[in-house]
A protein has these predicted regions:
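Short glycine-rich, polar/acidic loop-and-turn segments at beta strand-coil junctions
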Residues: 44-48, 67, 74
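Acidic, Ser/Thr- and proline-rich intrinsically disordered linker/docking segments
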Residues: 1-16, 20-22, 29-32, 53-54, ...
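The phosphoinositide-binding surface of pleckstrin homology
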Residues: 38-53
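A sequence-composition feature that detects small, non-aromatic residues
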Residues: 8, 46, 59-62, 121-123
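Secretory/extracellular carbohydrate-interaction modules
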Residues: 33, 37
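Polybasic phosphoinositide-binding surfaces of eukaryotic membrane-targeting domains
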Residues: 56-70
Length: 151
């Protein structure tokens, strides 16, 4: 059992109202694309869409020390993988409804909407993503300054 799948199961057990299916297959997509030395810090499950009635777009979202990975295994063949690096990350919006909540990740290119998340998990997701991205952006800025000095 991979670390991403294990953490996805822990999240699902802690927040059972979150809608999510095929966690093992979706987790395998992320594990296939982890870089050597990349550490998985936090994992959660959501639907990658904006429609609360569409419950077949389950994604496993992994926050690593380098980026955010969103993995979805297709039913027949292939998969989808989204990678959001700290330099592409702009903002995070949390929306809470009566049953579920949404996490909206604003990037340079698009808005990534993750829905049907147990409303009790929203604060934990916000804390993990925000704190990690702030730290990684600082590190990314230091790397850019070092490269400029080297030129």
């Amino acid at each position: 059992m991979g670390i991403v799948y294990q953490k996805a199961l822990e999240f699902k057990q802690k927040y059972p109202m979150t809608v999510g299916w095929r966690l093992k297959k979706n987790s395998e997509v992320i594990e296939r694309h982890l870089n050597p030395g990349e550490k998985v810090l936090y994992v959660f499950v959501a639907q990658k869409n904006d429609n609360p009635l569409d419950i077949i777009s389950t994604a496993v979202v992994a926050l690593t020390n380098e980026r955010i990975l969103i993995g979805r295994k297709r039913v027949v063949m292939g998969y989808f993988l989204d990678s959001i690096t700290p330099d592409m990350f702009n903002d995070l919006t949390i929306k809470q409804g009566p049953i579920w909540g949404k996490v909206i990740i604003d990037t340079v290119k698009e808005e990534v909407i993750l829905s049907n998340i147990d409303r009790n998990a929203l604060a934990e997701i916000d804390d993990n993503i925000t704190m990690t991205m702030i730290e990684e952006k600082k590190e990314y800025g230091r790397d850019l300054e070092t490269k400029k000095k080297d030129k």
